[in-house]
Amino acid sequence: MPGILVRPDQSFEEAYRLFKKQVDRNLIVTEARARRFYEKPTERRKKEKIAARKKMLKRLYMLRRYESRL
């Protein structure tokens, strides 16, 4: 769980910026949005499969693009 200790010489804006950075690193907002509604295990697997396919196609595209430059 993110948390920061505010020093006496630290402004609120700086402390808030550090807190936001920690929240982003820990993916708290993303996880909260994902858990907002129940997702069936089959739907989750389907999304993971689609994401894996997109990732593979992107890598393949980048590899072919790189090889064409050689």
Curated annotation (Swiss-Prot):
Keyword Ribosomal protein attributed: yes
UniProt entry tagged with the keyword RNA-binding: no
Domain of life: Bacteria
GO CC annotation terms, alphabetical: ribonucleoprotein complex; ribosome
A Gene Ontology biological process term: translation
A GO term for molecular function: structural constituent of ribosome
The entry's keywords: Ribonucleoprotein, Ribosomal protein
Protein family per UniProt: Belongs to the bacterial ribosomal protein bS21 family.
Protein name according to UniProt: Small ribosomal subunit protein bS21
Organism annotation: Nitratiruptor sp. (strain SB155-2)
Lineage: Bacteria, Pseudomonadati, Campylobacterota, Epsilonproteobacteria, Nautiliales
